[in-house]
Amino acid sequence: MSKQRPYVKFKQFQEQTGIFFRNEKLLIQAFTHSSYVNEHRKRLHEDNERLEFLGDAVLELTVSQYLFEQFPQMSEGELTKMRAAIVCEPSLVTFAHALSFGDLVLLGKGEELTGGRMRPSLLADVFEAFIGALYLDQGIEAVVQFLGKTIFPKIREGAFSHVMDYKSQLQEFVQRDGSGVLEYKILQERGPAHNKEFVSRVSLNGEELGVGVGRSKKEAEQRAAQMALAKLKQLQQG
């Protein structure tokens, strides 16, 4: 795809994603690297750096709002830690790869020869620039809708649960205290196939410590462990 004329591949991208830009120049700018601009000075091109700046802020805001609404039990520190894991470079690169953003980038010949198209920092910047372009073209709701198809489902599936790994914390707490054996059990699986919800229970030596609900078994277990951890810490404090 990267060898095609720019306008052709951007039209194909819009058809494939169902995201049609009112101002297609913004879309093209989002994928225009500074090296391309430097090699095409006779043409009116603008690189994606300003859009990246804007997209970074929009991404932080929308992810923050989603986490705030979806995880009411999380503290400010926990929310900050989770958000950092979602908007960090490795995560953005993963999202960019999933959407084949590397194929769309307009690069200078030198940057192309040195493997710039697949450079992690470049792909992360492009993802942020695309968010900035989408925001300018269609507003915050369009960004939320896009993230609802690309990032938010991964959060619900527990892709970032390692950041707030309550199961490991609970296991360490129990082992340190010498309390006994933890057991997780899925109590209920409810809802339609496309929107399932799981209820998990964690017990210590047969005694229920916490119950959690989540969009995946993993998330439900994490939430149950979080409740159990809070309960044990409270008991410890007297």
Curated annotation (Swiss-Prot):
GO molecular function annotation: double-stranded RNA binding; metal ion binding; ribonuclease III activity; rRNA binding
Active site residues of this protein: D56, E128
Any one Gene Ontology BP term: rRNA processing
Subcellular location(s) of the protein: Cytoplasm
Cofactor annotation: Mg(2+)
Residue sites binding Mg(2+) per the record: E52, D125, E128
Ranges of residues in domain RNase III: 10-139
Top-rank EC class of the record's enzyme: hydrolase
EC number: 3.1.26.3
Keyword Nuclease: yes
Matches recorded under InterPro entries: dsRBD_dom, RNase_III, RNase_III_dom, RNase_III_sf
Domain of life of the native organism: Bacteria
A GO CC term assigned to this protein in UniProt: cytoplasm
Catalytic activity, reaction form: Endonucleolytic cleavage to 5'-phosphomonoester
Entry annotated with the keyword Chloroplast: no
Residues covered by the DRBM domain: 165-234
PROSITE patterns cross-referenced by the UniProt entry: DS_RBD, RNASE_3_1, RNASE_3_2
Keywords (A to Z) from UniProt: Cytoplasm, Endonuclease, Hydrolase, Magnesium, Metal-binding, mRNA processing, Nuclease, RNA-binding, rRNA processing, rRNA-binding, tRNA processing
Function: Digests double-stranded RNA. Involved in the processing of primary rRNA transcript to yield the immediate precursors to the large and small rRNAs (23S and 16S). Processes some mRNAs, and tRNAs when they are encoded in the rRNA operon. Processes pre-crRNA and tracrRNA of type II CRISPR loci if present in the organism.
Record text on subunit structure and interactions: Homodimer.
Matches recorded under NCBIfam families: RNaseIII
Family: Belongs to the ribonuclease III family.
Protein name: Ribonuclease 3
Taxonomic source organism: Anoxybacillus flavithermus (strain DSM 21510 / WK1)
Upper taxonomic lineage: Bacteria, Bacillati, Bacillota, Bacilli, Bacillales
